[in-house]
């Protein structure tokens, strides 16, 4: 049986720098930064988008807490921001294999829950990742049911 495990919580604040400053003042001192370029689809429309990602591993018991700041291109939050505004919890995420993702796709399809955004990352600036791996991100449009979207993250190691 499939089981969703929250491994990542992401927020999309109006002012990412101010949000990070406040979180640092609250004890989240160490951040890992990455600028990502990705291509794929947002609600079925082909896109390329860019985002600044900031990760902290202290706030959430060693799991990922992410500040998401889209800088270029269309993204699924742009659609949701029309009704929900920019300050939001972006998603709850889980890492999985490509095989597990196939099962999750079927699970959500059977419940008429659409893919909000699916992208493959083209580039990363984080030296731990850059040139070594990419990701397939699939975000399901569960915001109207759960109040937040669900993201499945597949690591793709480069050989």
Residue ranges and their predicted role:
Residues 1-49:
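Long, hydrophobic N-terminal alpha-helical segment
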Residues 2, 6-14, 54-69, 79-100, 105-159:
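Vicinal oxygen chelate
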Residues 16-35, 82-87, 97-122:
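Extended intrinsically disordered, low-complexity coil regions enriched in Ser, Thr, Gly, Ala
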Residues 23-26, 69-76:
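Short, composition-biased local secondary-structure segments
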Residues 30-31, 75-76, 145-150:
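Short loop/beta submotifs within extracellular cysteine-rich repeat domains
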Residues 32-50, 73-82, 121-136:
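A cross-kingdom feature marking solvent-exposed beta-strand/loop segments within repeated
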Residues 36, 68-72, 97:
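Histidine- and/or cysteine-centered catalytic micro-motif in compact active-site loops
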């Amino acid at each position: 049986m499939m089981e969703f495990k929250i491994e990542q919580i992401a927020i999309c604040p109006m002012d990412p720098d101010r949000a990070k400053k406040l979180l640092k003042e609250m004890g989240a001192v160490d951040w890992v930064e990455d600028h990502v370029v990705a291509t794929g689809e947002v609600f079925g429309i082909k896109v390329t988008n860019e985002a600044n990602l900031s990760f902290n591993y202290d706030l959430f018991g060693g799991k990922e807490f992410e500040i998401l700041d889209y800088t270029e291109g269309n993204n699924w939050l742009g659609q949701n921001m029309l009704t929900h505004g920019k300050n939001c919890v972006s998603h709850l995420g889980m890492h999985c294999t490509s095989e597990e993702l196939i099962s999750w796709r079927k699970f959500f399809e059977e419940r008429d829950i659409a893919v909000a955004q699916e992208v493959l990352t083209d580039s990363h600036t984080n030296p731990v990742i850059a040139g070594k791996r990419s990701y397939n991100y699939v975000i399901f449009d569960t915001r109207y049911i759960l109040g937040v979207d669900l993201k499945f993250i597949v690591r793709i190691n480069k050989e």
